[in-house]
Amino acid sequence: MKKISSNFFCIFSFLVTQILLAKSNRIFDYSHLKGSKLSINAGPLSSKRAIIPYSFTKLHICNSKRLQRMEDTLGEILTGNKFYSTEYLAKVNEDTFCNILCFNNFTERDVNFYKKLIMRRYFVNMVVDKLPAGLILYNNQTKQTMIRYFDGIPIGYIKNNTFYIFNHLQFHILLNKVDTDKYNVVGFNILPMSIEHGEDTPKCVTRANLLLQNFNKSPQPLKEGRTLFTYDVIYEYSDIPFASRWDHYKISRASIHWTGIFISEFLVGIATIFVICLLRKNLRKDIDSYNYRVSQFEDINEYDWKQVAGDVFRPPSVNKLLLSSMIGTGCQLLSMLSFTLFLAVIGFMNPEKRNNILNIGILFYCFCGLFGGYVSANFYRFWGGNSWIRVSVFTSLLFPGIIICGYMIINIILIIENSNAAVNFSDILSLFILWIFCTFPLILIGSFFGYKSNQINIPCEINKIPSYIPEKPWYLHYRYITFLTGLIGFATIFIEFNYVMGALWRHQIYFLATFLFISIFLFAMVMGELSILVVYYNLCYGDYNWWWKSFIIGASPVIYFGMMAMISGMVILVCGAISVFFCLGFLNKIYSEIRID
Protein backbone atom coordinates (compact mmCIF):
# COMPACT_ATOMS: atom_id res chain seq x y z
CA MET A 1 0.00 0.00 0.00
CA LYS A 2 2.85 2.36 0.86
CA LYS A 3 4.53 1.56 -2.45
CA ILE A 4 1.35 2.39 -4.37
CA SER A 5 0.98 5.65 -2.44
CA SER A 6 4.59 6.64 -3.10
CA ASN A 7 4.24 5.86 -6.81
CA PHE A 8 1.05 7.91 -6.98
CA PHE A 9 2.79 10.80 -5.23
CA CYS A 10 5.69 10.63 -7.70
CA ILE A 11 3.33 10.66 -10.69
CA PHE A 12 1.31 13.53 -9.20
CA SER A 13 4.50 15.52 -8.49
CA PHE A 14 5.71 14.95 -12.03
CA LEU A 15 2.43 16.21 -13.52
CA VAL A 16 2.41 19.30 -11.29
CA THR A 17 6.03 20.02 -12.24
CA GLN A 18 5.23 19.75 -15.94
CA ILE A 19 2.28 22.11 -15.56
CA LEU A 20 4.40 24.67 -13.71
CA LEU A 21 7.15 24.39 -16.31
CA ALA A 22 4.62 24.84 -19.10
CA LYS A 23 3.26 27.96 -17.39
CA SER A 24 6.69 29.39 -16.69
CA ASN A 25 7.87 28.84 -20.26
CA ARG A 26 5.38 31.48 -21.38
CA ILE A 27 7.12 34.20 -19.45
CA PHE A 28 10.73 33.26 -20.13
CA ASP A 29 12.66 34.79 -23.02
CA TYR A 30 10.71 36.06 -26.01
CA SER A 31 12.89 39.13 -26.40
CA HIS A 32 14.04 40.72 -29.67
CA LEU A 33 17.28 42.53 -30.46
CA LYS A 34 17.18 46.09 -31.72
CA GLY A 35 16.99 46.14 -35.49
CA SER A 36 15.81 42.54 -35.79
CA LYS A 37 12.87 41.84 -38.06
CA LEU A 38 9.36 41.54 -36.61
CA SER A 39 6.95 39.46 -38.65
CA ILE A 40 3.51 40.99 -39.19
CA ASN A 41 1.15 38.15 -40.03
CA ALA A 42 -2.46 38.24 -41.21
CA GLY A 43 -5.17 35.72 -40.43
CA PRO A 44 -8.65 35.07 -41.77
CA LEU A 45 -11.20 37.73 -42.65
CA SER A 46 -14.10 37.36 -40.22
CA SER A 47 -17.35 39.19 -39.55
CA LYS A 48 -20.08 39.49 -36.92
CA ARG A 49 -22.68 39.53 -39.68
CA ALA A 50 -21.49 36.51 -41.68
CA ILE A 51 -20.23 33.11 -40.62
CA ILE A 52 -18.03 32.28 -43.63
CA PRO A 53 -14.40 33.40 -43.16
CA TYR A 54 -12.09 34.19 -46.06
CA SER A 55 -8.35 33.92 -46.46
CA PHE A 56 -6.22 37.07 -46.30
CA THR A 57 -4.92 36.20 -49.76
CA LYS A 58 -8.42 36.84 -51.18
CA LEU A 59 -7.78 40.57 -50.73
CA HIS A 60 -5.19 40.37 -53.52
CA ILE A 61 -3.03 43.03 -51.88
CA CYS A 62 0.25 43.17 -53.80
CA ASN A 63 1.37 39.72 -54.95
CA SER A 64 -0.63 37.48 -52.64
CA LYS A 65 0.85 34.36 -54.26
CA ARG A 66 4.19 35.16 -52.63
CA LEU A 67 2.72 35.14 -49.12
CA GLN A 68 3.86 32.15 -47.13
CA ARG A 69 1.39 30.24 -45.01
CA MET A 70 2.44 29.84 -41.41
CA GLU A 71 2.79 26.40 -39.87
CA ASP A 72 -0.64 25.10 -38.87
CA THR A 73 -1.75 22.77 -36.11
CA LEU A 74 -4.74 20.47 -36.45
CA GLY A 75 -6.82 22.86 -34.35
CA GLU A 76 -5.97 25.82 -36.60
CA ILE A 77 -6.85 23.82 -39.70
CA LEU A 78 -10.22 22.70 -38.37
CA THR A 79 -11.18 26.19 -37.16
CA GLY A 80 -9.97 27.89 -40.33
CA ASN A 81 -7.50 29.99 -38.33
CA LYS A 82 -4.81 30.03 -41.04
CA PHE A 83 -2.22 32.80 -40.95
CA TYR A 84 0.01 34.15 -43.70
CA SER A 85 3.14 36.26 -43.63
CA THR A 86 2.76 39.76 -45.07
CA GLU A 87 5.11 42.14 -46.84
CA TYR A 88 4.88 44.77 -44.12
CA LEU A 89 8.45 45.35 -42.89
CA ALA A 90 9.09 46.18 -39.23
CA LYS A 91 12.42 46.30 -37.41
CA VAL A 92 12.56 46.44 -33.63
CA ASN A 93 12.70 49.98 -32.21
CA GLU A 94 13.14 51.61 -35.62
CA ASP A 95 10.32 54.00 -36.51
CA THR A 96 9.48 54.36 -40.18
CA PHE A 97 6.87 56.56 -41.83
CA CYS A 98 4.95 56.52 -45.09
CA ASN A 99 6.50 53.27 -46.31
CA ILE A 100 5.29 52.07 -49.69
CA LEU A 101 3.89 48.55 -49.53
CA CYS A 102 2.92 48.22 -53.19
CA PHE A 103 0.81 49.56 -56.03
CA ASN A 104 -2.26 47.40 -56.46
CA ASN A 105 -4.34 47.11 -59.63
CA PHE A 106 -7.97 46.45 -58.73
CA THR A 107 -10.15 44.68 -61.27
CA GLU A 108 -13.94 44.90 -61.39
CA ARG A 109 -14.11 41.52 -59.66
CA ASP A 110 -11.82 42.75 -56.87
CA VAL A 111 -13.92 45.88 -56.35
CA ASN A 112 -17.14 43.88 -56.09
CA PHE A 113 -15.55 41.49 -53.60
CA TYR A 114 -14.28 44.39 -51.48
CA LYS A 115 -17.73 45.98 -51.51
CA LYS A 116 -19.24 42.74 -50.22
CA LEU A 117 -16.65 42.56 -47.44
CA ILE A 118 -17.19 46.18 -46.42
CA MET A 119 -21.00 45.91 -46.41
CA ARG A 120 -20.83 42.76 -44.28
CA ARG A 121 -18.27 44.41 -41.99
CA TYR A 122 -15.42 41.96 -42.41
CA PHE A 123 -12.27 42.52 -40.37
CA VAL A 124 -8.68 41.41 -40.91
CA ASN A 125 -7.05 39.59 -37.99
CA MET A 126 -3.38 40.62 -37.77
CA VAL A 127 -0.75 39.56 -35.25
CA VAL A 128 2.76 40.54 -34.19
CA ASP A 129 4.74 38.24 -31.92
CA LYS A 130 1.50 36.20 -31.53
CA LEU A 131 -0.37 39.24 -30.15
CA PRO A 132 -3.63 40.07 -31.99
CA ALA A 133 -3.95 43.66 -33.12
CA GLY A 134 -6.11 46.09 -31.22
CA LEU A 135 -8.07 48.61 -33.29
CA ILE A 136 -7.29 52.29 -32.59
CA LEU A 137 -10.37 54.46 -33.05
CA TYR A 138 -9.64 58.17 -33.60
CA ASN A 139 -12.17 60.98 -33.26
CA ASN A 140 -11.03 63.79 -35.54
CA GLN A 141 -13.25 66.31 -33.74
CA THR A 142 -12.28 65.62 -30.13
CA LYS A 143 -8.74 64.51 -31.08
CA GLN A 144 -9.10 61.52 -28.74
CA THR A 145 -8.36 57.86 -29.34
CA MET A 146 -9.58 54.60 -27.84
CA ILE A 147 -8.51 51.00 -28.40
CA ARG A 148 -10.94 48.18 -29.08
CA TYR A 149 -9.82 44.57 -28.93
CA PHE A 150 -11.21 41.33 -30.41
CA ASP A 151 -12.73 42.62 -33.65
CA GLY A 152 -9.70 43.05 -35.91
CA ILE A 153 -9.00 45.75 -38.50
CA PRO A 154 -11.75 46.92 -40.89
CA ILE A 155 -11.15 46.81 -44.63
CA GLY A 156 -12.96 50.04 -45.45
CA TYR A 157 -16.09 52.06 -44.81
CA ILE A 158 -19.12 53.59 -46.54
CA LYS A 159 -19.84 57.32 -46.51
CA ASN A 160 -22.47 59.09 -48.60
CA ASN A 161 -23.04 55.87 -50.60
CA THR A 162 -19.37 55.80 -51.58
CA PHE A 163 -17.00 52.96 -50.65
CA TYR A 164 -13.60 53.91 -49.26
CA ILE A 165 -10.69 51.58 -48.57
CA PHE A 166 -8.20 51.72 -45.70
CA ASN A 167 -4.99 51.77 -47.72
CA HIS A 168 -2.73 53.20 -44.99
CA LEU A 169 -2.07 51.31 -41.75
CA GLN A 170 -0.29 52.85 -38.79
CA PHE A 171 1.26 50.08 -36.66
CA HIS A 172 1.79 50.93 -32.99
CA ILE A 173 4.04 48.36 -31.30
CA LEU A 174 4.58 48.57 -27.54
CA LEU A 175 8.01 47.54 -26.25
CA ASN A 176 9.24 46.67 -22.78
CA LYS A 177 13.00 47.06 -22.41
CA VAL A 178 14.63 43.93 -21.02
CA ASP A 179 18.30 44.75 -21.46
CA THR A 180 20.52 46.94 -23.58
CA ASP A 181 19.17 46.71 -27.13
CA LYS A 182 16.84 43.89 -26.04
CA TYR A 183 13.05 44.29 -25.97
CA ASN A 184 9.83 42.37 -25.41
CA VAL A 185 6.71 43.09 -27.47
CA VAL A 186 3.90 43.79 -24.98
CA GLY A 187 1.29 45.43 -27.20
CA PHE A 188 0.19 45.75 -30.81
CA ASN A 189 -2.41 48.22 -32.11
CA ILE A 190 -3.33 49.47 -35.58
CA LEU A 191 -4.80 52.79 -36.68
CA PRO A 192 -6.30 52.36 -40.18
CA MET A 193 -6.54 55.37 -42.51
CA SER A 194 -7.77 56.11 -45.98
CA ILE A 195 -5.48 58.43 -47.99
CA GLU A 196 -5.79 59.22 -51.68
CA HIS A 197 -2.19 59.21 -52.85
CA GLY A 198 -0.76 60.54 -56.08
CA GLU A 199 -0.22 58.44 -59.16
CA ASP A 200 3.31 57.41 -58.22
CA THR A 201 4.12 59.08 -54.90
CA PRO A 202 2.49 58.81 -51.46
CA LYS A 203 0.91 61.82 -49.78
CA CYS A 204 1.10 60.59 -46.20
CA VAL A 205 3.03 62.53 -43.54
CA THR A 206 6.65 61.51 -42.95
CA ARG A 207 7.22 63.19 -39.58
CA ALA A 208 6.18 61.71 -36.23
CA ASN A 209 4.72 64.92 -34.78
CA LEU A 210 2.44 65.46 -37.79
CA LEU A 211 0.97 61.97 -38.20
CA LEU A 212 -2.58 62.94 -37.27
CA GLN A 213 -2.67 65.31 -40.23
CA ASN A 214 -3.22 62.20 -42.35
CA PHE A 215 -6.86 62.36 -41.28
CA ASN A 216 -7.22 65.66 -43.12
CA LYS A 217 -6.18 64.08 -46.41
CA SER A 218 -8.73 63.11 -49.04
CA PRO A 219 -9.83 59.47 -48.53
CA GLN A 220 -9.13 56.77 -51.11
CA PRO A 221 -12.32 55.64 -52.90
CA LEU A 222 -12.66 51.99 -53.84
CA LYS A 223 -12.42 51.84 -57.62
CA GLU A 224 -10.88 49.93 -60.48
CA GLY A 225 -7.31 50.72 -61.38
CA ARG A 226 -4.15 51.59 -59.51
CA THR A 227 -4.21 52.03 -55.70
CA LEU A 228 -1.19 52.71 -53.51
CA PHE A 229 -0.87 50.95 -50.12
CA THR A 230 1.34 52.50 -47.44
CA TYR A 231 2.08 52.05 -43.73
CA ASP A 232 3.86 53.49 -40.68
CA VAL A 233 5.66 51.59 -37.94
CA ILE A 234 5.80 53.41 -34.59
CA TYR A 235 7.33 52.02 -31.40
CA GLU A 236 6.25 53.11 -27.94
CA TYR A 237 7.84 52.23 -24.61
CA SER A 238 5.64 50.59 -22.01
CA ASP A 239 6.07 49.38 -18.44
CA ILE A 240 3.65 46.47 -18.99
CA PRO A 241 5.42 43.25 -17.93
CA PHE A 242 5.69 40.56 -20.57
CA ALA A 243 3.69 38.15 -18.41
CA SER A 244 0.77 40.64 -18.32
CA ARG A 245 0.60 41.53 -21.99
CA TRP A 246 -2.57 39.46 -22.50
CA ASP A 247 -4.50 41.24 -19.74
CA HIS A 248 -6.12 43.70 -22.18
CA TYR A 249 -7.83 40.79 -23.90
CA LYS A 250 -8.87 39.00 -20.71
CA ILE A 251 -10.71 41.76 -18.84
CA SER A 252 -13.11 42.71 -21.65
CA ARG A 253 -16.79 42.33 -20.74
CA ALA A 254 -16.09 40.45 -17.50
CA SER A 255 -18.98 42.21 -15.77
CA ILE A 256 -21.42 40.80 -18.33
CA HIS A 257 -20.09 37.33 -17.58
CA TRP A 258 -20.84 37.86 -13.90
CA THR A 259 -24.38 38.83 -14.89
CA GLY A 260 -24.73 35.52 -16.70
CA ILE A 261 -23.42 33.64 -13.68
CA PHE A 262 -25.91 35.46 -11.43
CA ILE A 263 -28.83 34.49 -13.70
CA SER A 264 -27.64 30.89 -13.73
CA GLU A 265 -27.28 30.79 -9.95
CA PHE A 266 -30.75 32.27 -9.55
CA LEU A 267 -32.33 29.58 -11.72
CA VAL A 268 -30.31 26.84 -10.03
CA GLY A 269 -31.36 28.15 -6.63
CA ILE A 270 -35.05 28.07 -7.55
CA ALA A 271 -34.80 24.55 -8.97
CA THR A 272 -32.77 23.29 -6.00
CA ILE A 273 -35.18 24.74 -3.41
CA PHE A 274 -38.11 23.19 -5.25
CA VAL A 275 -36.46 19.77 -5.39
CA ILE A 276 -35.40 19.89 -1.73
CA CYS A 277 -38.92 20.85 -0.62
CA LEU A 278 -40.30 17.99 -2.67
CA LEU A 279 -37.88 15.41 -1.31
CA ARG A 280 -37.94 16.45 2.33
CA LYS A 281 -41.68 16.94 2.63
CA ASN A 282 -43.58 14.84 0.13
CA LEU A 283 -41.24 11.90 -0.27
CA ARG A 284 -40.46 11.38 3.40
CA LYS A 285 -44.14 11.61 4.29
CA ASP A 286 -45.09 9.19 1.50
CA ILE A 287 -42.35 6.70 2.41
CA ASP A 288 -43.20 6.64 6.13
CA SER A 289 -46.93 6.30 5.44
CA TYR A 290 -46.40 3.53 2.90
CA ASN A 291 -44.03 1.52 5.11
CA TYR A 292 -46.41 1.80 8.09
CA ARG A 293 -49.40 0.57 6.10
CA VAL A 294 -47.39 -2.31 4.67
CA SER A 295 -46.26 -3.33 8.18
CA GLN A 296 -49.92 -3.25 9.36
CA PHE A 297 -51.03 -5.34 6.35
CA GLU A 298 -53.42 -2.64 5.23
CA ASP A 299 -54.75 -2.49 1.70
CA ILE A 300 -53.19 0.17 -0.47
CA ASN A 301 -55.65 1.33 -3.07
CA GLU A 302 -53.94 4.56 -4.09
CA TYR A 303 -51.96 4.56 -7.30
CA ASP A 304 -48.77 6.61 -7.20
CA TRP A 305 -45.00 6.28 -7.54
CA LYS A 306 -44.74 3.62 -4.82
CA GLN A 307 -47.06 1.26 -6.67
CA VAL A 308 -44.80 1.04 -9.73
CA ALA A 309 -41.78 -0.23 -7.78
CA GLY A 310 -41.82 -3.46 -9.79
CA ASP A 311 -41.73 -1.63 -13.12
CA VAL A 312 -39.69 1.51 -12.54
CA PHE A 313 -36.36 -0.13 -13.46
CA ARG A 314 -37.78 -2.04 -16.41
CA PRO A 315 -35.53 -1.65 -19.48
CA PRO A 316 -36.62 0.78 -22.20
CA SER A 317 -39.24 -0.75 -24.45
CA VAL A 318 -37.59 0.55 -27.64
CA ASN A 319 -34.08 1.33 -28.92
CA LYS A 320 -32.06 0.01 -25.98
CA LEU A 321 -28.93 -0.10 -28.13
CA LEU A 322 -29.35 3.50 -29.27
CA LEU A 323 -30.03 4.88 -25.79
CA SER A 324 -27.10 3.04 -24.18
CA SER A 325 -24.78 4.28 -26.93
CA MET A 326 -26.01 7.86 -26.52
CA ILE A 327 -25.48 7.74 -22.75
CA GLY A 328 -21.99 6.32 -23.22
CA THR A 329 -21.09 8.92 -25.84
CA GLY A 330 -22.45 11.65 -23.57
CA CYS A 331 -20.17 10.44 -20.76
CA GLN A 332 -17.24 10.39 -23.18
CA LEU A 333 -17.91 13.99 -24.23
CA LEU A 334 -18.50 15.06 -20.63
CA SER A 335 -15.15 13.56 -19.57
CA MET A 336 -13.40 15.26 -22.48
CA LEU A 337 -15.01 18.59 -21.64
CA SER A 338 -14.17 18.30 -17.93
CA PHE A 339 -10.49 17.47 -18.49
CA THR A 340 -10.05 20.18 -21.13
CA LEU A 341 -11.76 22.86 -19.03
CA PHE A 342 -9.73 21.84 -15.99
CA LEU A 343 -6.49 22.47 -17.88
CA ALA A 344 -7.87 25.79 -19.12
CA VAL A 345 -8.96 26.88 -15.62
CA ILE A 346 -5.54 26.18 -14.05
CA GLY A 347 -3.90 28.19 -16.84
CA PHE A 348 -2.30 25.33 -18.76
CA MET A 349 -3.64 26.57 -22.11
CA ASN A 350 -1.24 29.01 -23.70
CA PRO A 351 -3.08 31.99 -25.27
CA GLU A 352 -0.25 32.34 -27.78
CA LYS A 353 -1.26 28.93 -29.12
CA ARG A 354 -4.94 29.19 -28.39
CA ASN A 355 -5.94 26.58 -30.96
CA ASN A 356 -4.12 23.97 -28.89
CA ILE A 357 -7.27 23.71 -26.78
CA LEU A 358 -8.95 22.01 -29.75
CA ASN A 359 -5.95 19.71 -30.23
CA ILE A 360 -6.06 18.73 -26.57
CA GLY A 361 -9.85 18.31 -26.73
CA ILE A 362 -9.51 15.91 -29.67
CA LEU A 363 -6.90 13.85 -27.80
CA PHE A 364 -9.04 13.76 -24.66
CA TYR A 365 -12.02 12.66 -26.74
CA CYS A 366 -9.98 9.77 -28.11
CA PHE A 367 -8.71 8.60 -24.72
CA CYS A 368 -12.07 9.12 -23.01
CA GLY A 369 -13.43 6.45 -25.32
CA LEU A 370 -12.62 4.11 -22.43
CA PHE A 371 -15.33 5.79 -20.33
CA GLY A 372 -17.82 5.91 -23.19
CA GLY A 373 -17.39 2.24 -24.03
CA TYR A 374 -17.58 1.18 -20.39
CA VAL A 375 -20.78 3.09 -19.61
CA SER A 376 -22.62 2.13 -22.81
CA ALA A 377 -21.79 -1.58 -22.45
CA ASN A 378 -22.75 -1.58 -18.77
CA PHE A 379 -26.16 -0.06 -19.49
CA TYR A 380 -26.69 -2.32 -22.48
CA ARG A 381 -26.01 -5.43 -20.41
CA PHE A 382 -28.25 -4.15 -17.61
CA TRP A 383 -31.09 -3.82 -20.12
CA GLY A 384 -30.62 -7.37 -21.41
CA GLY A 385 -28.25 -6.77 -24.32
CA ASN A 386 -26.18 -9.77 -25.34
CA SER A 387 -23.30 -8.36 -27.40
CA TRP A 388 -20.67 -5.93 -26.13
CA ILE A 389 -19.11 -5.75 -29.60
CA ARG A 390 -22.36 -4.49 -31.11
CA VAL A 391 -22.76 -1.70 -28.57
CA SER A 392 -19.09 -0.70 -28.81
CA VAL A 393 -19.24 -0.43 -32.61
CA PHE A 394 -22.47 1.57 -32.40
CA THR A 395 -20.99 3.87 -29.72
CA SER A 396 -17.83 4.48 -31.73
CA LEU A 397 -19.81 5.29 -34.90
CA LEU A 398 -22.69 7.32 -33.43
CA PHE A 399 -21.17 10.73 -32.69
CA PRO A 400 -18.21 10.70 -35.17
CA GLY A 401 -20.53 9.53 -37.95
CA ILE A 402 -23.01 12.36 -37.39
CA ILE A 403 -20.21 14.92 -37.09
CA ILE A 404 -18.38 13.74 -40.20
CA CYS A 405 -21.56 13.74 -42.31
CA GLY A 406 -22.50 17.22 -41.13
CA TYR A 407 -18.96 18.53 -41.46
CA MET A 408 -18.56 17.19 -45.00
CA ILE A 409 -21.72 19.01 -46.10
CA ILE A 410 -20.50 22.24 -44.49
CA ASN A 411 -17.02 21.74 -45.96
CA ILE A 412 -18.42 21.38 -49.47
CA ILE A 413 -20.26 24.69 -49.02
CA LEU A 414 -17.05 26.33 -47.75
CA ILE A 415 -15.09 25.00 -50.74
CA ILE A 416 -17.71 26.40 -53.13
CA GLU A 417 -17.46 29.78 -51.34
CA ASN A 418 -13.62 29.67 -51.46
CA SER A 419 -13.64 30.06 -47.69
CA ASN A 420 -10.55 30.03 -45.52
CA ALA A 421 -12.26 27.46 -43.25
CA ALA A 422 -12.42 24.75 -45.92
CA VAL A 423 -10.46 21.65 -44.88
CA ASN A 424 -8.41 19.55 -47.28
CA PHE A 425 -9.15 15.86 -47.76
CA SER A 426 -5.74 14.93 -46.31
CA ASP A 427 -6.58 16.67 -43.03
CA ILE A 428 -9.93 14.86 -42.80
CA LEU A 429 -8.09 11.62 -43.53
CA SER A 430 -5.73 12.25 -40.60
CA LEU A 431 -8.76 12.57 -38.30
CA PHE A 432 -10.14 9.30 -39.65
CA ILE A 433 -6.80 7.56 -38.97
CA LEU A 434 -6.81 8.95 -35.42
CA TRP A 435 -10.32 7.58 -34.91
CA ILE A 436 -9.65 4.12 -36.38
CA PHE A 437 -6.37 3.54 -34.54
CA CYS A 438 -7.06 5.30 -31.23
CA THR A 439 -10.71 6.02 -30.43
CA PHE A 440 -12.23 2.80 -31.74
CA PRO A 441 -9.81 0.42 -29.96
CA LEU A 442 -10.22 2.30 -26.66
CA ILE A 443 -14.02 2.12 -26.92
CA LEU A 444 -13.71 -1.63 -27.57
CA ILE A 445 -11.55 -2.05 -24.47
CA GLY A 446 -13.92 0.02 -22.34
CA SER A 447 -16.94 -1.91 -23.63
CA PHE A 448 -15.30 -5.24 -22.84
CA PHE A 449 -14.67 -4.29 -19.21
CA GLY A 450 -18.06 -2.57 -18.91
CA TYR A 451 -19.87 -5.67 -20.14
CA LYS A 452 -17.90 -7.97 -17.82
CA SER A 453 -18.22 -5.75 -14.73
CA ASN A 454 -20.98 -5.85 -12.14
CA GLN A 455 -24.41 -4.71 -13.26
CA ILE A 456 -26.12 -1.62 -11.92
CA ASN A 457 -27.61 -2.37 -8.50
CA ILE A 458 -31.33 -1.70 -8.12
CA PRO A 459 -33.41 -1.92 -4.91
CA CYS A 460 -36.47 -3.56 -6.51
CA GLU A 461 -37.15 -6.69 -8.49
CA ILE A 462 -38.73 -6.20 -11.90
CA ASN A 463 -42.16 -7.73 -12.43
CA LYS A 464 -42.45 -10.26 -15.22
CA ILE A 465 -45.62 -8.66 -16.56
CA PRO A 466 -45.60 -4.89 -17.18
CA SER A 467 -48.20 -2.91 -15.27
CA TYR A 468 -50.90 -0.88 -16.97
CA ILE A 469 -50.05 2.81 -17.45
CA PRO A 470 -53.11 5.02 -16.81
CA GLU A 471 -53.84 8.33 -18.45
CA LYS A 472 -52.00 11.38 -17.13
CA PRO A 473 -52.50 15.14 -17.52
CA TRP A 474 -51.59 16.55 -20.93
CA TYR A 475 -48.95 18.91 -19.54
CA LEU A 476 -46.84 15.97 -18.33
CA HIS A 477 -46.40 14.59 -21.84
CA TYR A 478 -42.78 15.11 -22.82
CA ARG A 479 -43.90 16.65 -26.11
CA TYR A 480 -44.99 19.71 -24.11
CA ILE A 481 -42.79 19.60 -21.02
CA THR A 482 -39.58 19.60 -23.07
CA PHE A 483 -40.27 23.13 -24.30
CA LEU A 484 -40.50 24.43 -20.73
CA THR A 485 -37.50 22.53 -19.35
CA GLY A 486 -35.47 23.40 -22.44
CA LEU A 487 -36.26 27.09 -21.99
CA ILE A 488 -35.12 27.03 -18.35
CA GLY A 489 -31.91 25.17 -19.22
CA PHE A 490 -31.18 27.47 -22.13
CA ALA A 491 -31.68 30.55 -19.94
CA THR A 492 -29.02 29.15 -17.61
CA ILE A 493 -26.29 28.91 -20.22
CA PHE A 494 -27.21 31.25 -23.10
CA ILE A 495 -25.14 34.30 -22.04
CA GLU A 496 -21.90 32.37 -21.69
CA PHE A 497 -22.75 30.29 -24.75
CA ASN A 498 -23.20 33.49 -26.76
CA TYR A 499 -19.66 34.66 -25.96
CA VAL A 500 -18.10 31.27 -26.65
CA MET A 501 -19.82 30.98 -30.02
CA GLY A 502 -19.00 34.61 -30.86
CA ALA A 503 -15.32 33.94 -30.20
CA LEU A 504 -15.50 30.75 -32.27
CA TRP A 505 -17.17 32.27 -35.33
CA ARG A 506 -15.06 35.46 -35.28
CA HIS A 507 -11.77 33.60 -34.62
CA GLN A 508 -11.24 35.46 -31.36
CA ILE A 509 -9.66 34.42 -28.09
CA TYR A 510 -11.80 33.10 -25.25
CA PHE A 511 -9.93 33.37 -21.95
CA LEU A 512 -12.63 33.15 -19.32
CA ALA A 513 -12.56 29.38 -18.83
CA THR A 514 -13.51 29.77 -15.16
CA PHE A 515 -16.80 31.43 -16.12
CA LEU A 516 -17.47 28.68 -18.64
CA PHE A 517 -16.68 25.97 -16.08
CA ILE A 518 -19.07 27.49 -13.52
CA SER A 519 -21.79 27.97 -16.13
CA ILE A 520 -21.58 24.37 -17.33
CA PHE A 521 -21.69 23.09 -13.75
CA LEU A 522 -24.79 25.17 -12.97
CA PHE A 523 -26.34 24.12 -16.27
CA ALA A 524 -25.81 20.45 -15.42
CA MET A 525 -27.39 20.95 -11.99
CA VAL A 526 -30.47 22.66 -13.45
CA MET A 527 -31.06 19.98 -16.08
CA GLY A 528 -30.51 17.17 -13.57
CA GLU A 529 -32.98 18.69 -11.10
CA LEU A 530 -35.58 19.39 -13.78
CA SER A 531 -35.38 15.83 -15.03
CA ILE A 532 -35.93 14.54 -11.47
CA LEU A 533 -39.06 16.68 -11.10
CA VAL A 534 -40.55 15.59 -14.42
CA VAL A 535 -39.82 11.90 -13.81
CA TYR A 536 -41.23 12.06 -10.27
CA TYR A 537 -44.53 13.58 -11.35
CA ASN A 538 -44.83 11.08 -14.19
CA LEU A 539 -44.31 8.26 -11.70
CA CYS A 540 -47.02 9.72 -9.49
CA TYR A 541 -49.42 9.09 -12.39
CA GLY A 542 -48.09 5.56 -12.93
CA ASP A 543 -45.91 6.22 -15.99
CA TYR A 544 -42.76 4.19 -15.33
CA ASN A 545 -41.26 4.56 -18.83
CA TRP A 546 -38.74 7.14 -17.68
CA TRP A 547 -35.46 6.18 -19.35
CA TRP A 548 -36.02 7.91 -22.67
CA LYS A 549 -38.03 10.70 -21.05
CA SER A 550 -35.19 11.62 -18.69
CA PHE A 551 -32.75 11.71 -21.61
CA ILE A 552 -35.08 13.88 -23.70
CA ILE A 553 -35.71 16.28 -20.80
CA GLY A 554 -31.96 16.74 -20.36
CA ALA A 555 -31.55 17.26 -24.09
CA SER A 556 -34.48 19.68 -24.39
CA PRO A 557 -32.38 22.91 -24.47
CA VAL A 558 -31.30 21.90 -27.97
CA ILE A 559 -34.65 23.27 -29.20
CA TYR A 560 -33.38 26.78 -28.48
CA PHE A 561 -29.90 26.41 -29.93
CA GLY A 562 -31.05 27.02 -33.47
CA MET A 563 -29.16 25.83 -36.52
CA MET A 564 -25.92 24.79 -34.83
CA ALA A 565 -26.65 21.12 -35.37
CA MET A 566 -23.25 19.69 -34.50
CA ILE A 567 -22.88 21.62 -31.25
CA SER A 568 -26.46 20.76 -30.43
CA GLY A 569 -25.63 17.09 -30.92
CA MET A 570 -22.97 17.35 -28.24
CA VAL A 571 -25.43 19.13 -25.95
CA ILE A 572 -27.97 16.33 -26.49
CA LEU A 573 -25.53 13.57 -25.56
CA VAL A 574 -23.94 15.30 -22.56
CA CYS A 575 -27.16 16.60 -21.02
CA GLY A 576 -29.06 13.40 -21.72
CA ALA A 577 -26.40 11.28 -20.03
CA ILE A 578 -26.36 13.62 -17.02
CA SER A 579 -30.14 13.39 -16.67
CA VAL A 580 -30.15 9.58 -16.82
CA PHE A 581 -27.58 9.34 -14.02
CA PHE A 582 -29.41 11.89 -11.88
CA CYS A 583 -32.70 10.04 -12.25
CA LEU A 584 -31.10 6.62 -11.71
CA GLY A 585 -29.54 7.78 -8.44
CA PHE A 586 -32.76 9.47 -7.35
CA LEU A 587 -34.93 6.41 -7.98
CA ASN A 588 -32.40 4.08 -6.40
CA LYS A 589 -32.54 6.20 -3.27
CA ILE A 590 -36.29 6.54 -2.86
CA TYR A 591 -37.14 2.91 -3.72
CA SER A 592 -34.51 1.61 -1.32
CA GLU A 593 -36.43 3.37 1.47
CA ILE A 594 -39.71 1.47 1.03
CA ARG A 595 -40.57 -2.11 1.88
CA ILE A 596 -41.40 -4.30 -1.09
CA ASP A 597 -43.59 -7.39 -0.59
Where are these regions (language model features)?
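Cleavable N-terminal signal peptides of Sec/SRP-targeted secreted and luminal proteins
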Residues: 6-21
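Hydrophobic alpha-helical transmembrane segments corresponding to the first two to three helices
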Residues: 247-415, 448-453
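Membrane-lumen (extracellular) interface motif
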Residues: 333-367, 373-394, 404-432, 493-516, ...
